[in-house]
């Protein structure tokens, strides 16, 4: 059985706090499948509960990841896994690009920027969410650079999930919904069956987060004409 995210008005009000950026349509951009759950699952849950619609652009098939036994073609399985995980998280629209996993930093930033800008337009996003470059690898840094350029061109804010203590960061408290949020996050991560051997470590990391998520701006609303200024 899986647990899926839903939106209820009384719960949505609980997340209309100053700590959560205001958004109607959130686009998450990731380097590889699984990050939408393991890294962004908490913030995406909060946005979904606040009433925002969610979309996802994953730039690679994650074909270089180590896989659990029993799977012969990881690149064929992972797009299906991300669709299942997205459904559990309440993400309504998913695009998976086919850039080479492990080589995102070798693509021209302008090429990745164009792909992200297209997704912003396609899904009418008014906020973009990524993994902060200081918490990921060189692929995540490449995504953050391209997303920054795309957000500036599209005139939408760009938020990043980061770690505590980073300059300019703030915390989002999932509050009473934390237990449900983490259960949904873990259920979505478990949808990536090719990565089942890594699941216990991921669950341990999520458990250590408790009810808190840490975010910071890469492109703040103050840099985007016509956008409301939010925390940070």
Where are these regions (language model features)?
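Metal-dependent de-N-acetylase/amidase catalytic core
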Residues: 1-29, 93, 102, 106-232
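ATP-dependent adenylation/pyrophosphate-handling site
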Residues: 15, 22-73
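A conserved beta-strand->alpha-helix junction
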Residues: 59, 87-100
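Flexible loop residues that form catalytic
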Residues: 62, 99, 133
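Short, hinge-like loop/turn segments at secondary-structure boundaries
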Residues: 71-75, 112-114
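Short, solvent-exposed amphipathic alpha-helices that sit
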Residues: 74-89, 145-150
